[in-house]
Amino acid sequence: MRRSIKKVAAGLLATMMIGTMLTGCGGGNKKDSGSSKKETSEINIGFSQVGAESDWRVANTKSMKSALTAKNGFKLSFADAQQKQENQTKAVREFITQGVDVIAIAPVTETGWETVLKEAKKADIPVITVDRQIKTSDDSLITAWVGSDFKKEGVKAAEWLIKEKGKEKGDVNIAVLQGTIGSSAEIGRTKGFKEGIKDQKNFKIIASQTGEFTQAKGQEVMESFLKQNKDIDVVVAQNDNMAFGAIDALKAAGKTPGKDVTIISFDAIKAALKKVQSGEINAEFECNPLHGPRVAELAKKIMKGEKVDIPAGTTIFGVTVTDNYDIDIY
């Protein structure tokens, strides 16, 4: 998705760019997925969504539903897992029983999918993973993945923080609000950030706990962090809703978010960008939720028996408080 960003005059930080990956899984040995299926006038697709735990997820669901319409040649069966993997497994089995043409999954966690994916493969139903990834011992169980490079997002966040605070003489105390443990977003952002700061001896992660990608839990965990240690210099929230919760907790504790405590967040939903402009969030890294059109395109290619090997995706931005941009384009 193209972004039009207006820069303020001279002396501002350059916008850091990170890339999404829209790629077929399994390296270069892609199979001609769907080649045994007949092309039909309507593609029956079952989509198992994580839930509605965040504003990003709501936007992702809207994008999928908007793209997978009858007008566009699809019949969509939608299942909300309410953040429970067992609900997703049940939904996928129902899709298999229904005989859908394609299954799309935005998984709660990376692991625990082997059995049900083998069932889908046995039924000759291709599977597309959306946003988060799934780890299996057999790459052929997943036909394609549409999502972001979460590890690179974490690395870029670390690079920004080093640029801002790397030369400080004292310790920089960091609190991390993790997403759902075991999700590829949590794994990638955690790993990327830790690897990015490993050579900064004065950077100390003094607290780290899941906020489950929700605002309420993010606030609860941040309140707990503040009770345990008031000397927190930086909060890294692995999505915007948790950042909002952290901001509320900091304000309640008499601290000024963005000034007393540096806030780094991910997703770049519109409400978060407003907080970048107001100075409450210092750095924001976008993770585009609009995967629907790409999933629709992939599903059509798969049903035609075409190879789905997509090497690159759109360019997205890391924006900071020093940027001036038109929020209404988001």
Where are these predicted regions, by residue range?
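Short beta-strand elements at the ligand-binding edges of bilobed clamshell
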Residues: 78-80, 136-162, 208, 278-289
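Short, solvent-exposed amphipathic alpha-helices that sit
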Residues: 56-70, 74, 153-157, 184-203, ...
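Extracytoplasmic "Venus flytrap"
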Residues: 43-71, 76-90, 94, 98-100, ...
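Hydrophobic alpha-helical segments within soluble ligand-binding/sensing domains
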Residues: 45, 88, 145-172, 217-219, ...
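Short, low-complexity disordered leader/linker segments with a strong preference
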Residues: 1-44, 69-70, 118-125, 329-330
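Flexible loop/hinge segments that line or gate small-molecule binding clefts
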Residues: 111, 115-152, 173, 269-277, ...
